[in-house]
Regions:
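Conserved Switch II/interswitch segment of TRAFAC-class P-loop GTPases
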Residues: 94-112, 136-138
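Conserved C-terminal guanine-recognition region of P-loop GTPase G domains, centered on the G4
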Residues: 110-123
């Protein structure tokens, strides 16, 4: 993913540097390779060029997750669409798999194909359906995804290309760039729902400031 660019961060090291570190993967090495956003979020940047991704193997993915689990409350992995061996390892190590889909016929087809693959590796029960770029008037409905996949939508994110582009170009997260926008509220609701499921007794306001921070 491009989280570092979206957050206006300039990483000096990436996940490739961590994977190639001869001292192995430790919390010290992981921390030194991460960038820290003003919100407290730690970001491990993706490879600086596509060809470098070949240095990331399944054992690196597992080691990074295993180390990070002991130090971070929440770990978010932006795995993309290709189900490579390192990605499958990440999915197998995850508590939840958020399947993000735009509301169109191609996404509907891909969602079913993805679900079939996840079923083959016994990961289908982790899937939570996220509907992205939702608009009220559309030939493809949220219910089409729900009926085809046999699961309810976990979260629905409204379409607002103008606000998203402005947020990206400014290097600010949506929820701080334009917190009153419907799309920002949708994302906050999604995050708070996840937090409340994990830690039920805590309020959204209490946890919002520490989402993604170290323990």
């Amino acid at each position: 993913g491009d989280a570092d660019m979206a957050l206006d961060l300039n990483p000096s090291e990436t996940i490739v540097d961590l994977a190639r570190d001869t001292n192995g993967i430790s919390i010290d090495n992981l921390s030194s390779c991460c960038c820290t956003h003003a919100s407290g979020l730690s970001v491990l940047a993706s490879p600086s060029s596509p060809e470098l991704a070949e240095y990331i193997q399944s054992n690196h993915t597992k080691a990074i997750i295993d180390v990070a689990r002991n130090y971070y409350e929440y770990i978010i992995l932006d795995c993309g669409c290709a189900l490579t061996d390192p990605v499958i390892t990440a999915l197998e190590s995850s508590d939840d798999i958020f399947m993000v889909n735009d509301v169109n016929i191609l996404s509907l087809k891909r969602a079913k194909l993805c679900q079939n693959v996840l079923s083959q590796i016994n990961q289908q029960d982790k899937v939570k359906l996220i509907i992205n770029k939702n608009v009220k008037k559309n030939n493809v409905k949220i219910s089409d995804f729900e009926n085809l996949l046999g699961i309810d939508a976990y979260a629905v994110i409204s379409s607002d290309l103008k606000t998203v582009n402005s947020s990206l170009n400014s290097g600010q997260p949506l929820i701080t760039y334009k917190p009153r926008a419907v799309i920002a509220k949708d994302i906050s609701s999604f995050a708070n729902k996840l937090i409340m499921e994990r830690e039920g007794t805590l309020t959204a306001t209490t946890k919002k400031k520490s989402f993604g921070k170290k323990k």
